[in-house]
């Protein structure tokens, strides 16, 4: 049984923690007060079965899937809550408001220095493997950042894409003058509109919520399915 540390409570980080938590001791570090808040990703699943294998029937029902032409819409913030609970039930240690201040690697282990966390104390975590998934998370409060290491393999810089999303009444889709790159009709009478940048168009009733992110994925690749596939590939890498 290995000691695994995952930095970043993204969908990728949560799925990876659930997979690793069945076989290893896992610590999930997130700089936010609550994982998935604010939610800055589309609530978009292309194929339900990709997510259903991680959730039970009651959890699936709670997400209130609604079919769209490009898959299914769901409440992204609810998914974060459900996956966080599942990770905790598997024994994953979750450190919130926790910032990595230093990472030192040797041939046999990685030493991670942190500040904050559940006990609001500085700490040292020694692990066999660390995954840095901070690129997939929302911007940190107060512009706080982790201090990570630069590795030519796992931590190499990727191309970043900026996305802007807005939530409005579903009826507003008839009034759009700027075609969104991604549109998701939700079960709650609301609709997610996603663009590469904030549109000049404004809903007549205004934006109920606005979201922004900068991550290494184009908008067309931001389905929850792709996040799951990436997490699964990282988990498989532990065995190679």
Model-derived segments and spans:
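N-terminal Rossmann-like FAD-binding beta1-loop-alpha1 element of flavoenzymes
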Residues: 2-27, 223-238
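Fold-independent oxyanion-binding glycine-rich loops
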Residues: 9, 31, 133-134
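Glycine-rich nucleotide phosphate-binding loop and flanking beta-alpha elements
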Residues: 13, 35, 137-139
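Hydrophobic beta-strand segments of well-ordered beta-sheets in folded domains
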Residues: 3-5, 24-27, 128-131, 205-210
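Class I S-adenosyl-L-methionine
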Residues: 18-21, 84, 88
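Predominantly flavin-linked oxidoreductase catalytic cores and closely associated redox partners
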Residues: 90-207, 214-237
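Short beta-strand to alpha-helix junction loop
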Residues: 66-86
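N-terminal FAD cofactor-binding segment of flavoenzymes
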Residues: 15-67, 77-78
């Amino acid at each position: 049984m290995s000691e695994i540390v995952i930095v970043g409570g993204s969908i990728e980080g949560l799925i990876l923690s659930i997979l690793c938590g069945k076989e290893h001791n896992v610590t999930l570090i997130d700089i936010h007060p609550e994982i998935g808040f604010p939610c800055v990703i589309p609530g978009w699943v292309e194929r339900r079965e990709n997510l259903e294998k991680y959730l039970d029937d009651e959890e699936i029902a709670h997400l209130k899937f609604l079919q769209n032409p490009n898959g299914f819409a769901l409440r992204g913030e609810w998914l974060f809550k459900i996956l966080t609970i599942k990770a905790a039930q598997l024994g994953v240690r979750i450190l919130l408001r926790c910032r990595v201040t230093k990472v030192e690697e040797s041939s046999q282990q990685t030493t991670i220095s942190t500040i904050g966390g559940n006990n609001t104390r500085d700490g040292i975590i020694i692990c066999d493997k660390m995954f840095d998934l901070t690129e997939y998370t929302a911007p940190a409060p107060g512009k706080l950042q982790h201090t990570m290491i630069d590795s030519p393999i796992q931590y190499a810089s990727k191309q970043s894409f900026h996305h802007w999303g807005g939530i409005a009444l579903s009826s507003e889709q008839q009034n759009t003058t700027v075609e969104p790159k991604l549109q998701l009709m939700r079960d709650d009478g609301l609709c997610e509109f996603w663009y590469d940048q904030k549109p000049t168009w404004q809903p007549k009733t205004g934006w109920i919520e606005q979201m922004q992110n900068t991550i290494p994925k184009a908008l067309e690749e931001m389905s929850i399915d792709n996040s799951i596939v990436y997490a699964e590939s990282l988990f498989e890498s532990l065995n190679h």
